[in-house]
């Protein structure tokens, strides 16, 4: 069997939905975590520079920002690991379905992988046999866990609900920055509003970013317009938008994972039909 035919047979059983969802998950998490981390840093600098001169006013905010940044590190690590596990589950379940119902045949690729895991031909040294045995045990344990798609359905469902809340929360800073940017546009083009320029303000206290006793806590008029024109404000605003898009992409990937895992579970346990997920 040629290499091309071998690859073609392997692709027949590839879980394409899981492959797409994994790529989307990695992209979304990287975008959300990377841009979100830098956007929080930019917000901290903007608050320190323009909205409050007293460190005690924004000390709690800085602690919250730093805590969120540490959570971002953990989120990135978890999702990259869990995405890889879900992809492995997709391959495992697809192979199981096709083996059970005769749609998936063992190829030279599978035989070669099996030989690699089990140590190959005789004549290997004891060190090579020990390494192969250890790898075989790891694969066996992983295979036993991957053999329960219902677990992945439950975990992914719970994770999707949690991430839905994260997605909603990621829209809050976008809303705040958009309101500030809209106010700046009204200041830049006074003909669009009947209010005086001096009364148009961005109040960080109104959104709970700063306590009500913070001074000045808000910026108005031409001072606010000058802030909106800074590269720091523009960059932070766009970073929050990118983080929001990343959260949306991650949510879509989780929904795709959940649908694929649920469908595979139903096929294996109830329907008895093959699937390409």
Curated annotation (Swiss-Prot):
As for subcellular location, the record says: Cell membrane; Myelin membrane
Query: What domain of life does the UniProt record list for this protein's source?
Result: Eukaryota
Positions modified as Phosphothreonine?
116, 118
Q: Which InterPro entries match?
A: Myelin_PLP, Myelin_PLP_CS
The molecular function terms in GO held by this entry are: identical protein binding; structural constituent of myelin sheath; structural molecule activity
Tell me how this protein sits in the membrane: Multi-pass membrane protein
**Disulfide bonds, paired cysteine numbers:** 184-228, 201-220
**Lipid tethering residues (O-palmitoyl serine):** 199
Give residue ranges on the Extracellular side.
Answer: 37-63, 178-233
In this UniProt entry, which residues form the Cytoplasmic topological domain(s)? 2-9, 89-151, 261-277
Concerning its family, UniProt says:
Belongs to the myelin proteolipid protein family.
Subunit notes for this chain? Interacts with MAL.
Q: What is this protein called?
A: Myelin proteolipid protein
Q: In which organism is this protein found? A: Homo sapiens (Human)
In the UniProt record, the gene name given for this protein reads PLP1
């Amino acid at each position: 069997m040629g290499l091309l035919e071998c690859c073609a047979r392997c692709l027949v059983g590839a879980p394409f939905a899981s492959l797409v969802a994994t790529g989307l998950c990695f992209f979304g998490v990287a975008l959300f975590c990377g841009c979100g981390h830098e956007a929080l840093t930019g917000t901290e600098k903007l608050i320190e520079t323009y909205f409050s001169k007293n460190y005690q006013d924004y000390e709690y905010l800085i602690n919250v920002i730093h805590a969120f940044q540490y959570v971002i590190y953990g989120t990135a690590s978890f999702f990259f690991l869990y995405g890889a596990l879900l992809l492995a589950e997709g391959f495992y379940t697809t192979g199981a379905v096709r083996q059970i119902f005769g749609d998936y045949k063992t190829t030279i690729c599978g035989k070669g992988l099996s030989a690699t895991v089990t140590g190959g031909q005789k004549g290997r040294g004891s060190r090579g046999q020990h390494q192969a045995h250890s790898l075989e045990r790891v694969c066996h344990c992983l295979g036993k866990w991957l053999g329960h798609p219902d677990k992945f359905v439950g975990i992914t469902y719970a994770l999707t609900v949690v991430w839905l809340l994260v997605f909603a929360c990621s829209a809050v800073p976008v809303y705040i920055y958009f309101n500030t940017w809209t106010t700046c546009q009204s200041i830049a083009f006074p003909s669009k509003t009947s209010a005086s320029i001096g009364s148009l303000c961005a109040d960080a206290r109104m959104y709970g970013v700063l306590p009500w006793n913070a001074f000045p806590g808000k910026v108005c008029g031409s001072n606010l317009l000058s802030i909106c024109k800074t590269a720091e404000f523009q960059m932070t605003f766009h970073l929050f938008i990118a983080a929001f898009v990343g959260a949306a992409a991650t949510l879509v990937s989780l929904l795709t994972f959940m649908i694929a895992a649920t469908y595979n579970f139903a096929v294996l346990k109830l329907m008895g039909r093959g699937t390409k997920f």
